[in-house]
Amino acid sequence: MGRTLESKKQIVEELKALLDQAEMALVIDYQGLTIKEMSDLRTRLGPSSGICKVTKNTLMRKAIDGDTSWSSLESLLNGTNAFVLVKGDVGGALKAVQAFQKETKKSKTKGGLFEGKLLSQDEIKAIANLPTKEVLMAQIAGALNSIATKMAVGINEVPSGLARSLKQHADSGEN
């Protein structure tokens, strides 16, 4: 038995709400995946605030209709699609999807949309390979700390160098 018009409208509204919160959308061909494997993917996406939704392309088309930030997804809406909507850690979600695909070898990423730009396979891989925000912040903090340390050593070296020069001059004057 098919869905009623009312339930379809409710699904479209739910998709619109998810898209409003999402920073990125990833379109995956899920053909051949079992329910258990889809549950595994959803579990993996949890820590990165990603959601995996399987819905008809026509319902997703209605959800993005008139929304310029998501309208580029239109070109990916064919075949059997699962939509990964990420509202948190984009890199973490992409890494989770890639690890899942590597293990199952059953699904492939058709493309994605990030900040209104359609992403190719290579661009998606590049984003997934970026370090996490925490790692980047640690690297920046380390770089700033090393600059401060080098400045302190440099500032301390001026009087020390002067003292060594004076001592050397005084020692040479005694002879």
From Swiss-Prot:
Gene Ontology CC terms, in alphabetical order: ribonucleoprotein complex; ribosome
CDD domains: Ribosomal_L10 (cd05797)
GO molecular function: large ribosomal subunit rRNA binding
Keywords: Ribonucleoprotein, Ribosomal protein, RNA-binding, rRNA-binding
Biological processes per GO annotation: translation
Pfam families: Ribosomal_L10
Biological role stated in the UniProt entry: Forms part of the ribosomal stalk, playing a central role in the interaction of the ribosome with GTP-bound translation factors.
Family: Belongs to the universal ribosomal protein uL10 family.
Subunit structure of this chain's protein: Part of the ribosomal stalk of the 50S ribosomal subunit. The N-terminus interacts with L11 and the large rRNA to form the base of the stalk. The C-terminus forms an elongated spine to which L12 dimers bind in a sequential fashion forming a multimeric L10(L12)X complex.
The protein's name: Large ribosomal subunit protein uL10
Originating species: Prochlorococcus marinus (strain MIT 9211)
